C-alpha cells in the first residue's frame, strides 16, 4: 500500500475538514480540487500526481503537482501561466500533461473552459451599466411626504388669498376690512393693480383724438374761444383789483389866517 492510499483511507473513514456531506453526495471545499467532488480521483491530498486550473487577477494558471516535489511543501506546486488565446492555452496543457491520465487531462480542460467563460462574463458586466441600489429610510420618506403636502396646502392658501384680494381691489373694497392675512400677498396684489393702472394711463396719453366738424361749427368754436379769452382777461383784472387795492390819498387842508 502506497502513501496515497493511506491518506485516502484516513480521510475517507476518519475526518477531513474540506468535506461537505449532503443527502445527494459529498463535496470538497478545497481550492485545488479540479471537480469539487469528494472521491478518490478528485482528492488533491490523496494524489501525488495532480493538476488543476486557477485564476489570479484575471489571469489563468495551470498548477501541476508531481511526486518528485512532495517532500518540499513550498515547491510542491508548479505554476504555469496560460496564454489568452484558447488554442495556445490548450496546447500548453497538452505539453505539460503529455503522459498523464486522460481523466485528469479532460477535467483540467473542462475547468479551463469554465474559468475562461466566467472571466468573459465578469468583463462584460464591468463594462455594462448597472443599477445601484440604495436603502431608503421609511421614517425619512414619510417625513418628506408630510412636508410636501404641507407646502402644497400653504401654496394653495396663499393663492386663494391673493385671488380674494384682487377681487376686493377690483370691487373698490376698503383695505381696512382685511384682517389676519399675509401682508406680502396684499402688497403683491396692490403692486400688480398699480402697474396695470399706470400702463392704462400711458396708453391713453399716447392716443390722439381726431374730430371732424363743419365750417359753421369751426366759426362758432373760434367765437367761443375769443369770448373765453376776454372773460379770462376780465377775471384777471378783477383779481388784480381785489388783491392790490389802491390806497386812499390823504388830503390836507390849509386855512389862511387874516392879518
UniProtKB/Swiss-Prot annotation:
> Disordered: where is this region?
195-215
- What is one GO biological process annotated to this record? maturation of LSU-rRNA
- Region feature (Nucleolar localization/retention signal): 97-150
- The answer on whether this UniProt entry bears the keyword Phosphoprotein reads yes
Record motif Nuclear localization signal, residues: 245-251
Instruction: Give the location in the cell.
Output: Nucleus, Nucleolus
Q: Which residues carry this modification: Phosphoserine?
A: 199, 231
Question: What GO terms fall under cellular component here?
Answer: nucleolus; preribosome, large subunit precursor
Acidic residues bias located where?
195-210
What keywords tag this UniProt record? Nucleus, Phosphoprotein, Ribosome biogenesis
Presence of the UniProt keyword Ion transport in the record? no
According to its UniProt entry, what is the function of this protein?
Answer: Involved in biogenesis of the 60S ribosomal subunit.
Q: Which family does it belong to?
A: Belongs to the MAK16 family.
Q: Which PANTHER family does this UniProt record tie to the protein?
A: MAINTENANCE OF KILLER 16 MAK16 PROTEIN-RELATED (PTHR23405), PROTEIN MAK16 HOMOLOG (PTHR23405:SF4)
Its protein name is Protein MAK16 homolog
Organism of origin is Schistosoma mansoni
Question: Source gene?
Answer: MAK16
Amino acid at each position: 500500500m502506497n502513501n496515497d492510499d493511506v491518506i485516502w483511507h484516513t480521510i475517507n473513514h476518519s475526518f477531513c475538514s474540506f468535506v461537505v456531506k449532503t443527502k445527494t453526495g459529498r463535496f470538497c471545499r478545497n481550492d485545488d480540487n479540479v471537480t469539487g467532488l469528494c472521491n478518490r480521483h478528485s482528492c488533491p491530498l490523496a494524489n501525488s500526481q495532480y493538476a488543476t486550473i486557477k485564476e489570479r487577477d484575471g489571469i489563468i494558471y495551470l498548477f501541476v503537482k508531481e511526486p518528485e516535489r512532495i517532500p518540499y511543501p513550498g515547491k510542491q506546486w508548479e505554476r504555469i501561466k496560460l496564454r489568452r488565446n484558447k488554442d495556445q492555452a490548450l496546447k500548453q496543457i497538452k505539453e505539460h500533461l503529455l503522459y498523464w491520465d486522460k481523466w485528469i487531462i479532460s477535467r483540467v480542460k473542462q475547468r479551463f473552459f469554465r474559468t475562461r467563460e466566467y472571466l468573459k462574463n465578469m468583463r462584460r458586466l464591468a463594462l455594462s451599466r448597472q443599477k445601484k441600489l440604495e436603502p431608503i429610510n421609511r421614517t425619512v420618506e414619510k417625513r418628506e411626504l408630510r412636508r410636501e403636502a404641507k407646502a402644497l396646502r400653504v401654496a394653495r392658501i396663499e393663492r386663494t388669498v391673493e385671488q380674494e384680494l384682487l377681487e376686493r381691489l377690483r370691487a373698490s373694497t376698503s383695505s381696512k376690512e382685511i384682517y389676519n392675512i399675509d401682508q406680502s400677498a396684499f402688497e403683491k396684489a396692490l403692486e400688480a393693480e398699480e402697474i396695470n393702472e399706470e400702463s392704462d394711463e400711458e396708453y391713453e396719453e399716447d392716443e390722439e383724438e381726431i374730430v371732424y366738424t363743419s365750417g359753421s361749427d369751426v366759426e362758432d368754436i373760434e367765437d367761443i374761444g375769443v369770448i373765453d379769452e376776454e372773460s379770462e382777461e376780465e377775471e384777471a383784472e378783477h383779481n388784480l383789483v381785489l388783491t392790490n387795492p389802491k390806497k386812499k390819498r390823504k388830503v390836507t387842508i390849509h386855512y389862511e389866517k387874516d392879518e
